[in-house]
């Protein structure tokens, strides 16, 4: 799984290899991949205001600079083709707290052709293994729009448990949306891994 590391601006990023997906650090050459989906209303329908439209090349450059700058509180990976390393989307651990042993995960599988094939679930599995086994975290959490049933199912299959609903929490596309909080604990994840 962990095959090598790449030095970032302020930290070393691992490269995580799966059968059907590769998690690698961002590169400057990923900008066209980012820009290829960020103005697609279907791809961004359930994402935070970071990807509100119109999404300009400058927005993409700013996001890429943020991803490349790294830091001890975040690790941002590109989900890529395991052979060509072509950009498919992104997955991250953000707000990493070594003291609390927690982090938040964010996932975007950018193109429809890659969805529904288990790629997101495999990427989550790679990231969770790294978070729990290598970083020593004890809890990984996320939030997801309640109506995003495809993502919620993916997260449930990856071992996340729904912990609660914040009603009418986020404004997006002209209305307020309920947001579901989900999390997985290291012990729960380890038990699932043993049974797999």
Go through each PLM region and give its residues.
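Acetyl-CoA-dependent GNAT
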Residues: 54-113, 185-188
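Short glycine/proline-centered loop/turn elements that form peptide/ligand docking sites
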Residues: 120, 124, 147-151, 168-173
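Conserved catalytic-core motifs of GNAT/GCN5-like acyltransferases
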Residues: 141-144, 161-181
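A short, well-structured alpha-helix characteristic of acyl/acetyltransferase catalytic modules
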Residues: 2-61, 188-196
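Conserved GNAT acetyl-CoA-binding A-motif
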Residues: 133-143
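Active-site acidic-Proline motif in GNAT/NAT acetyltransferases
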Residues: 111-113, 117, 133, 146-147
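Conserved acetyl-CoA-binding loop-helix of GNAT-fold acetyltransferases
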Residues: 116-130, 152-157
């Amino acid at each position: 799984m962990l095959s090598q590391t790449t030095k970032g601006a302020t930290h070393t990023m691992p490269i995580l290899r799966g059968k059907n997906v590769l998690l690698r650090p961002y590169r400057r050459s990923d900008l066209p991949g980012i820009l290829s989906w960020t103005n697609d209303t279907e791809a961004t329908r359930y994402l935070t205001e970071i990807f509100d439209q119109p999404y300009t090349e400058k927005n993409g450059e700013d996001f890429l600079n943020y991803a490349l700058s790294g830091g001890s509180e975040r690790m941002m990976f590109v989900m890529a083709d395991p052979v060509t390393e072509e950009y498919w989307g992104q997955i991250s651990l953000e707000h990493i707290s070594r003291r609390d042993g927690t982090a938040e995960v964010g996932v975007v599988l950018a193109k429809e052709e890659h969805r529904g094939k288990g790629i997101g679930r495999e990427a989550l599995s790679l990231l969770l293994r790294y978070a729990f086994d290598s970083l020593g975290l004890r809890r990984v959490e996320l939030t997801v729009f309640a109506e995003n049933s495809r993502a919620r199912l993916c997260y449930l299959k990856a071992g996340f448990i729904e912990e609660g609903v914040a009603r009418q929490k986020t404004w997006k596309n002209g209305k307020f949306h309920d947001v579901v909080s989900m999390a997985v604990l290291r012990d729960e994840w380890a038990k699932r891994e043993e049974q797999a």
